[in-house]
Amino acid sequence: MKVSYKKLWIMCAEREISKGELRKRAGVSSATFTKMRRNQEVALSVLLKIADVLECNAGDMMDFIKDEDYAHQNIDVDEVW
């Protein structure tokens, strides 16, 4: 299984929250944000900080995708944001 943060990026675009603003408000490092942009796993504590800022649940920001379906679900974050 792979993780996809597509829902997070869409949520931020809809709320007009920039990457920098979200990072600062959540207290997340740029290195961690880069991992998320690459759909790499991050600590649950990071997800909870972001969820707190966005007033949502961690599950609202991400999906788990089967390995064989992952290539079809991957998006370019810059297209959304």
Where on the chain are the PLM-derived regions?
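Residue-level detection of the helix-turn-helix DNA-binding "recognition helix"
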Residues: 13, 27, 38, 66
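A short, Lys/Arg-rich alpha-helix, primarily the initiator
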Residues: 1-18
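Residues within the helices of the helix-turn-helix
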Residues: 9, 20, 48, 59
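Short alpha-helical DNA-recognition segment
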Residues: 16-35
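Short, charged recognition helix plus adjacent turn
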Residues: 10, 63-81
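Short, basic-rich loop-to-helix N-cap that marks the start of a DNA-contacting helix
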Residues: 40-52
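The alpha-helix within a helix-turn-helix
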Residues: 12, 23, 37, 51
